[in-house]
Amino acid sequence: MKAASSDQNQKKKRPQGHTASVLDLSNLSSPAPKKAHKKILNDIQWPGSPHSNPEGSSHYGYQEYTPAQFPVANRFTEMMRMSALGILVVMVLNFGSVYSQGKSLRHDVVAASSEGVESITQSDSLNGTVLTNAALQFEEAEQSLWFLQSQGTALKQGTPSVESIPELLRAAQDLSSAAAGFMEFAVALKNPAQPLLSRQPVPRPSLTTPLLTSFEKHFQPAVLKVISANRVLQTAPLSVVPSTLQPELSRAKEEIAQLSELLILFNEAFPVMLQLLGSEHPQHYLVLLENNNELRPGGGFIGSYLLIDLNDGYLDELSFHDVYDVDGRFSEIIPPPEEIATLTDRWGLRDSNLSPDMSLSAQKAQWFLEKEGGPSTDHVITVDLETVRQLLAMIGPVAVEGLQKPLEADQFETVLSYIVESKLSGAESPKTIFNSFIPAVEAQLREGGEGFPLVGLISEMARQKHLALYSKQEDIQAFFERWGMAGKIVAPPANEDVLMVVSTSLGGNKSDAYLSQRVDHHTVLTQSGALLDTLTLTRQNNWSETEKEKVRELLGSYGFKAIDEEVMTILGAGTNVAGLRVYVPQGVSLQDVQGLSGTEVTVRHDEALGLDYFYFKSIVAPGEQQKITLTYELPFGSKNGMKEISSTTHGVCRSLKI
């Protein structure tokens, strides 16, 4: 990595004590943020009631099916619309009952506030003009509300709950005033002195200081107003409005409560975002590019990585590296763990992600990079193919130098893998294509101005565990963990049933792209109080001649006609060979094995996670299916035949009363 110049590393000194901070909201009551699930299960089903057999045992079970490929939704736009509409609902619907005695006045307020929100929700892209106009329209609404407040005596006449009217009016005023503050903050976000993450020579204006100033001046006071208004709304009785409007007021309460939660979360997140942009010190990132068509417990095979330096919001470095370069220069022999000993006799960065806890895998990757002569980094970002696929779906096809047509979301992986595995750019530098692909993606992302959707994509990919973040800085790592972005495995409480199935590709190919897996798990409570789990894994290799022709047709459309059979084997036609770990509670006793010989399954212990796991190999040829069933007794039971247990799979916890 190139050393950054001393000018680039120098940061403008801030006034003493003027650092990004989280607004103290401890004195305001607001609903606590909802905790996100740590992992997603695809198509999980739970029985509504237990099934009993003639022997008196009770059965509980679920089914999970993981297809070879599945789409991921982006919900960020809907979340932003919900937030803006929350303001509109309260400002319009709540006022409706109070303004029923002054229709002309009501019309002025509704029109002004509606126009302001529509400027947010209906514009295709946020720009300075739109945001400025929206702020002016919200200001008009605020002026109307001040006039309304002076008419309190008249408004009280005939009102069922007169004491709530002044509070509702003040809440309405707070909301409209807050909306104007949010617009001012949005203008600062949208119109920095230079584009965020741009490359600019020094001297250059600070990008993070104006953002922090606007955050403290406009956003944080607006948050306080929304929380205060929410507190008033939650205590206001529905009887304050006519019965015909009570359902709408109820919905308005819910919307503003959700908006309040979102703003509190953003208030916590924004100072951390500034830190990550290098607001106080330059930040150094290791981005692991993992191929989840060749699975590893911590994501996928690490074929390449990026080194990124951010300083005061500017991108000072972005460089691409082939993992075999740094591994190849490392002369020390570190024996690999037993489970990957058939792949290599030297452990290196490319095989560092062997823990399903992505934080632990990230730490190991940092260790190997430094051990092998690479730079020290502050943070690690783990990214797999699904994240890139969704990014391309968001920004559109990308034109890459040397290709006959742009790369699309559902094509890029096959095309780039073929170019690399065929060594079209030479055996010494097979990944040269990425030196064109990555800048092309970066340029198109900038041109499209996809800032808000990109934040939503990052959040969604982290939720799906296609992306994970790790930081050496304890406060930032704690933030990642609270937001469910660290990929961390949380140790379960004592006497809880746990199930997590992870895979390590051992076949040297990308056949995991065509491998679907079904997990059937049943818990039986016997009359004696013992708990027996039965786990069935059904693994199907979906590669076929049809898939082969699809690959040939796709590559042919890019001008690649003669596809070598050996390369086709690597792309997915080869036999799927995997080392499987089935994580279970510590102390389980294996009772029976079907589909494998008993000697092929060993019980091992993961000290870092505090869990046992069954380890065995699975071999599935193209077009074939393998079914493996394990029966094991849990180390805890129920003396009286009634006990509450939980089954945790991939981090999602469900409770069953038995």
Spans of features found by a protein language model:
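Sec-dependent N-terminal signal peptides of Gram-positive bacterial secreted proteins and lipoproteins
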Residues: 81-96
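Arg/Lys-rich low-complexity patches in intrinsically disordered regions that function as generic
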Residues: 11-17, 34-35
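Non-catalytic, solvent-exposed segments at the cell envelope interface
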Residues: 2, 19-27, 37-46, 59-61, ...
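N-terminal intrinsically disordered, low-complexity regulatory segments of eukaryotic proteins
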Residues: 1-14
